[in-house]
Amino acid sequence: MIGILGGMGTQAGLDFCNKLAILNRGKVDQEYPLFILYNKSNIPGRPESIGVQTGNLSNKSSNSNSKKKYNLVLKSLLQGCKLLEKNKCKFIVIPCNTAHYWFDDLQKKINIPIINYSRKI
């Protein structure tokens, strides 16, 4: 079972699921891959929590709350990963480039692999 942590944006998760189905077509429905999409759209803003202002991505924020924001996003991502792990997924895919900023911290806290886009592409 593939675990997909989506919702960052929702369309990216749906697009990934669509491509997964197209690229792994079976002759009958039962041959398609098994997956769970958790569309966790309530994850706080990722760019802001790593010190990037969304109005101008080249301007770093000097906000002293960035560590707090970082940890809020980490907690929310971890909740999603734990839910997928609990539901017997063999690995997790997160179709959001920015979410991979938390990859190392997430991977330390769960027992199944997370596929890291930035290291696989």
Give a label for each model feature.
Residues 1-121:
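Non-catalytic structural scaffold of enzyme domains
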